[in-house]
């Protein structure tokens, strides 16, 4: 399949069918047994050494958030940020309602807050591809709608593709540039 800029690709399928494995292959966390993975005309699947997603300029929000447990929220967010003092940084933190949580440690956060921190970190990387594995699973309805709005705006403004695994695919019905990928 091919996903173009400013498009949301929603990967659907029953549990255990390989949705997360597909994301890990694209992100470079697993090596494909066959085929090619191409991002911005570069064949990523030819990289035989393990390459972290951020080194491929891929923003990846994992199911389990992958926050660093021994540093605070602000340092977690800034870990891969390209513009640590920019207006963009402040705008994203404010939109995700994280201002009052910057000095907290990850273990002090709810699942929904950890999810928003992980999404914030991925956006501040300014990636050429955004991969989100169950980005709404720990969010209440209001925060899900807020994050959805932020993602739509970010993807549209930055003209990058976004690949999402989500069991709540109804959230994407109003997206204008939507591609559904069903794994069986």
Language model: regions and residue ranges:
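Conserved ABC ATPase signature
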Residues: 105-109, 113-115
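Hydrophobic anchor residue at the start of the ABC signature
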Residues: 119
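A short, proline-enriched helix->beta-strand linker immediately N-terminal to the Walker B motif
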Residues: 124-128
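Catalytic Walker B motif of ABC-type/P-loop ATPase nucleotide-binding domains
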Residues: 130-134
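Helix-to-loop junction immediately C-terminal to a conserved catalytic motif
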Residues: 27
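ABC ATPase NBD coupling module
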Residues: 44-59
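Conserved ABC transporter NBD signature motif
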Residues: 35-46
């Amino acid at each position: 399949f091919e996903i173009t800029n400013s498009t949301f690709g929603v990967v659907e399928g029953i549990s255990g069918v390989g949705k997360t494995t597909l994301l890990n292959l694209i992100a470079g966390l697993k090596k494909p047994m066959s085929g090619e993975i191409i991002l911005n005309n570069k064949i990523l699947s030819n990289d035989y050494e393990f390459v972290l997603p951020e080194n491929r300029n891929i923003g990846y929000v994992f199911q389990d958030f992958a926050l660093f447990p021994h540093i605070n929220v602000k340092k977690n967010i800034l870990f891969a940020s390209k513009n640590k003092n920019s207006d963009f940084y402040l705008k994203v933190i404010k939109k995700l309602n994280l201002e009052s949580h910057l000095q907290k440690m990850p273990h002090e956060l709810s699942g929904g807050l950890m999810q928003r921190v992980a999404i914030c970190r991925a956006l501040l990387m300014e990636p050429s591809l955004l991969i989100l594995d169950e980005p709404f699973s720990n969010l209440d309805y209001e925060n899900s709608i807020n994050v959805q709005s932020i993602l739509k705006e970010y993807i549209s403004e930055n003209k990058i593709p976004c690949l999402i695994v989500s069991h709540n695919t109804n959230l994407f019905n109003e997206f204008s540039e939507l591609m559904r990928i069903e794994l069986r």
